[in-house]
Swiss-Prot record:
Native source organism of the sequence: Methylobacterium nodulans (strain LMG 21967 / CNCM I-2342 / ORS 2060)
Principal subcellular localisation of the protein: membrane
Pfam family, one: UPF0060
InterPro entries from the UniProt entry: UPF0060 (IPR003844)
Name of this protein: UPF0060 membrane protein Mnod_6500
Membrane-spanning residues: 4-24, 31-51, 59-79, 85-105
Domain of life: Bacteria
Length: 107
């Protein structure tokens, strides 16, 4: 599994899992949302172990930018709220940081 695919899958799983808890506590949905939510959060954790990195902290730091970008896609696609220029600019900065972490030479 490629690192990018693992990061994107992890982001979707984490956001879906957290949204299930949000739906239960904030939107008044059934507690039955928690089962799939917990499964999604477990999948998120497993997927992060699949990235190509010798250090967990570096893998998590690089993942942060992908998570932010995926959260804005969720905001638009699932919640129907279009990200504004500040959202997009912030995500671009975070993705630049992700690229530095992932692509920087290691010696």
């Amino acid at each position: 599994m490629t690192t990018l695919l693992a990061y994107v899958g992890a982001a979707l799983a984490e956001i879906a899992g957290c949204f299930a808890v949000w739906a239960w506590l904030r939107l008044g949905r059934s507690p039955l949302w928690l089962g799939p939510g917990l499964a999604s959060l477990a999948l998120f954790a497993v997927l992060l172990t699949r990235v190509e990195s010798g250090a967990a902290g570096r893998a998590y730091a690089a993942y942060g930018g992908v998570y932010i970008a995926a959260s804005l896609v969720w905001l638009w696609g699932v919640e129907g709220q279009r990200p504004d220029r500040w959202d997009l600019g912030g995500a671009a900065l975070c993705l630049a940081g992700t690229a530095v972490i992932l692509l920087g030479p290691r010696g």
